[in-house]
Regions:
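Alpha-helical membrane-protein topology signature
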Residues: 1-227
Length: 227
């Protein structure tokens, strides 16, 4: 048992490091946005979804919901604030129409998280039931986070171009999902296992597409490709 706990701790630390890289991987994209003072054809969807995902996983990792999940809490707490920062850049450089949609989405997320926290803390007493309720919600939003970059796949296949599908983000998503899948297997936590196993599949699909269409991509083209 001690060896298993040590293995979980080591894998969890590795998972935190890779998750950190995942959260930092879009940074070149936002440097590009800031230099151009425009969001161009990049979409905020993955970042807005990840804000909610990190908020819910941070709540799941708190000791009054689940025990011994401090690694889940710390990395998702960091991710929450970083994704808010990314979303803020989108707000700063988006036209009013897109800005309004982002603000409405963030408002809806804030209301949803507040309602979940209130309901769980005031109406659900046992940790087992709290973990079940919050865990199921986390599964749903974790899957959304991993699959949100796939909104670009149709356009990638149509245009035979991966210009607006960031390789670093796809690779980090894949590695992150694989490590947390291993962590979940050691602990046998289905709430962590299910979304991350699907996330590994999502990341693999993105990497395959990148390999297939990399050579056919015109990196100098200015045509609008939605992400």
């Amino acid at each position: 048992m001690a060896d298993l706990n040590l293995a979980r701790l080591i894998i969890g630390i590795i998972g935190n490091v890779i998750s950190f890289c995942l959260f930092m991987s879009p940074m070149p994209t936002f440097v590009q946005i800031c230099k151009a003072k425009s969001v161009q054809d990049f979409k905020p969807d993955p970042y807005v979804v990840t804000v909610l995902n990190c908020a819910m996983w941070s709540f799941y990792g708190m000791p009054f919901v689940t025990k011994n999940n401090v690694l889940v809490l710390t990395i998702n707490g960091f991710g929450f604030f970083l994704e808010l920062f990314y979303t803020g850049i989108f707000l700063a450089f988006s036209p009013w129409g897109k800005r309004r949609k982002i603000l409405l989405a963030l408002l809806a997320e804030a209301i949803f998280v507040a309602l979940v926290v209130f309901f769980v803390l005031y109406f659900v007493e046992s940790l087992k039931e709290r973990a079940l309720i919050v865990g199921l919600i986390c599964i749903f939003f974790n899957i959304l986070m991993y699959f949100s970059p796939l909104t670009v796949i149709r356009q990638v296949i149509k245009d035979k171009s991966v210009k607006y599908m960031p390789f670093c983000l796809s690779l980090a998503n894949f590695c992150n999902a694989v490590v947390w899948t291993v962590y979940a297997c050691l602990k046998w936590d289905l709430f962590i296992l299910i979304p991350n196993a699907l996330g590994a599949l999502s990341g693999l699909v993105q990497l395959i597409l990148y390999a297939v269409f990399y050579r056919s991509t015109n990196w100098d083209q200015e045509s609008a490709i939605e992400v």
